Amino acid sequence: MSEYIEREELRIDDPEYNILVENDDYLVYKKYETVRLYMKKQKQLVWCIGDFYGDAEGAIITEDNQWCIMYGCGIIAYRLKEPFDDYSYDTVCEQWSEFRRGPKDILWVEKVVQTSPTSMLVISEDESKYTLDILDNHLKLERI
């Protein structure tokens, strides 16, 4: 659910908030374990694009502005296009994809870096490296 809101009303200077990534079009921030998206041009806030056990570690917006990749306890890749649905656990949809977030396969991610228009380097807590590929809008995570 998105809501019209002026950026000044976000109160992002509040210590409860933490900006994860910002560009000309979007501001992505966390409040506790919830990640939120503010669409600057539309002045709309999406209440929840991700939820992380232990807080999100970080986020990137892809160079083409098509995806927000959030990470920490696993990865959530959120597609930056209508209808901007609110994230919910264990939901299969086109708005987002989840990777390595289940209790039996958690990957603690320290950093994600975009290495090409369709590929990200994922570095885990134990310094293992993975690739996250976005090909034809399909996402795949593989250890390298």
Report residues per predicted region.
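Surface-exposed loop/turn elements that mediate protein-protein interactions on large endomembrane-trafficking
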Residues: 1-11, 31-51, 76-103, 125-144
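Amphipathic alpha-helical binding modules
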Residues: 110-133
